[in-house]
Amino acid sequence: MAWLQPTLCRKELESRQTSGLDAAMKAAGKKYFGTALTVRNDAGETNVLNTKGEFGSITPENAMKWEAIQPNRGQFNWGPADQHANAATQRGMELRCHTLVWHSQLPSWVANGNWNNQTLQQVMKDHINAVMGRYKGKCTHWDVVNEALNEDGTYRDSVFYRVIGEAFIPIAFRMVLAADPTTKLYYNDYNLEYGGAKTAGAIRITKLIQSYGLRIDGVGLQAHMTSESTPTQSTVTPSRANLASVLNSFTKLNVDVAYTELDIRMNTPANQQKLQANAAAYARMVGSCMDVKRCVGVTVWGISDKYSWVPGTFPGEGSALLWDDNFNKKPSYTSSLNTIRACWKCHRLLVSIS
């Protein structure tokens, strides 16, 4: 039996059908390259989504959030969520489901209800059981709890924390495990990529869940980044090595990691210099996942700049995704694909041949 050296390993991987992001990721030993999606009637978006090997996972952008699914107590709106589940099934893609317990996009009847510990837990359980029952066996991953932390690593003020305390987090994980033990369970948050107090807070949450004897399969780092200093974010995307170090701070706790909502914004309008800097930032993000064995995949938060949430939330900023408004691939697409194909750390994925 012979072992391929890194250069030969790259050739072996490139000889496979790695013309798309997901195909290249899988050839390099990862699970998926995915996208967030809002189902709509746009031929350009559909064409990209249907391109073989481009995406292997779909995350419903908004359709599975509490406000969308159960706007009034006991009244469920399954239509949009079902559309996304069907979109994944029809294309043979994984369905990365998002999200069950979150302070935002929460209907007022939950956020402003007169709850005590017992009654709010019952509301959580009823919602989780209904949603998990509907999509049992379809969701490969669930963001169980989303954005429970402030920037300084303390707990965010939410109805769940005010009424139940930090225990609402392991309680939610216990409920989800009981409803569907086959799905992968994640804690998901933003600004974890920098290795500061908020990262330490997410490590604390991971240990808290484990201290209850419960399973947490992974931590999702949302990765809403910038490729240059902007009015809303002065710190640009860190180095590849620093990003990998943060990922490893979680994997040391015996959990997987993933970039779950990746986009990298800039001050608009874009120009070639900014697009190249953006491409380099994407290479650092994707490359850091390639460098960490238990980084299972990358999800970008949308296909095209045409529908990105960024300009509406951060005026004067944008051009954050891999396709432009007209569904043309940007330099960031090429840099991401080339980074995956380069098969960094390939010597750890040695391919045996007879």
From Swiss-Prot:
Query: Where does the GH10 domain start and stop, copy by copy?
Result: 19-339
Q: Where in the cell is it found?
A: Secreted
- Identify a single GO molecular function assigned to this protein: endo-1,4-beta-xylanase activity
Q: Which UniProt keywords apply?
A: Carbohydrate metabolism, Disulfide bond, Glycoprotein, Glycosidase, Hydrolase, Polysaccharide degradation, Secreted, Signal, Virulence, Xylan degradation
Where primarily located? Answer: secreted
Q: Which InterPro entries match?
A: GH10, GH10_dom, Glycoside_hydrolase_SF
Q: Does the keyword Hydrolase apply?
A: yes
Q: Report which reactions are catalysed by this protein.
A: Endohydrolysis of (1->4)-beta-D-xylosidic linkages in xylans
Q: How does activity depend on pH?
A: Optimum pH is 6.0.
By its UniProt entry, which PROSITE patterns does this protein fall under? GH10_2 (PS51760)
Which Pfam families does the record associate with it? Glyco_hydro_10 (PF00331)
Q: Which residues are glycosylated?
A: N117
Induction context: Expression is under the control of transcription factor XYR1 and highly induced by xylan.
Pathway, per record: Glycan degradation; xylan degradation
Temperature effects on activity = Optimum temperature is 40 degrees Celsius.
Name of the top EC class for this enzyme: hydrolase
What's an example GO cellular component term for this entry? extracellular region
The record's EC number reads 3.2.1.8
* Disulfide pattern: C289-C295
Its BP terms in the Gene Ontology are:
xylan catabolic process
- State the active site: E147, E261
Q: Which family does it belong to?
A: Belongs to the glycosyl hydrolase 10 (cellulase F) family.
This protein is called Endo-1,4-beta-xylanase 1
Q: Which organism is it from?
A: Gibberella zeae (strain ATCC MYA-4620 / CBS 123657 / FGSC 9075 / NRRL 31084 / PH-1)
Q: What gene is this protein translated from?
A: XYL1
